[in-house]
């Protein structure tokens, strides 16, 4: 244990201390002491008991792995960690990972924890996908993402939706309304997206292109649902450009609503009575559908209105779910099952 500690924080072997100190460059020496200082301050401060326990366990593991071999002064042990979330509370997992990041170690960890993924830069994540005849590994690679795209993905996926990195397919929708409607209507059709590895993700905040580029690089299938308004047409054009205007690929990856937005689409698909009821406007009152929808949103909210429509579809049965959405569900399930084991 003494020799291992000396390897990291002083020198390898007490007898060679003076000789090695003279040979080592000043920058390396300062770095070693900086690591030691950081760890000392961490374990000495109030509430540092958890750090001390982790540090002792770590060094015990390293000592057992080292055996009687003498480590080179530039050696950096490779620490393999298998599913640490199975033994650690999420808070302790965060503490342990933070401590490991301070040590000059190489680390490979396998995990099914979104909590751990949220602590790891996406550039350091490698997805393992079990296919019919092999296990494929997907990662961003040396070129990675642009600085702006990396920032957007980190905020939208890593920090807010880390579990989506385990998904087989992303269904990308414009906003919260579509998220509520699509999840509920899929459930009523007997499709359990969570069990199929499908994640519905809104893209308006982060932008569509970064999400699609990231999904492709990480081996995640994807499908995009867009509105029929001007913004939706631009999103559709973005998808087509990413697919090199391949018509067959477009059928697999793009669904466009034949209406301005989800509210107008569902109104025309037989749910006008829901909008009139929420807007408190009798159906026999002549009024432009845009005004009816606007009043319904004003008296409720877009997400609440979407939930009302979805619940009404549940009461009416599967036949009330628009055919366009049923076809989209089938495509998304097909994409997801193509990645199934």
Predicted regions and their residues:
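Terminal low-complexity/disordered tails
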Residues: 305-341
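Extended hydrophobic secondary-structure segments that form protein cores and membrane-embedded regions
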Residues: 77-83, 199-202, 254-256
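Amphipathic alpha-helical domain-onset/packing element
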Residues: 1-25
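RecA-like P-loop NTPase motor core
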Residues: 117-118, 123-231
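Conserved, well-folded catalytic cores of nucleic-acid-processing
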Residues: 4-11, 62-63, 160, 185-192, ...
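Switch/communication elements of ASCE P-loop NTPase nucleotide-binding domains
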Residues: 34-160, 237, 334
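Activity-critical C-terminal alpha-helical subdomain
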Residues: 234-308
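Active-site-adjacent bridging/hinge elements
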Residues: 24-36
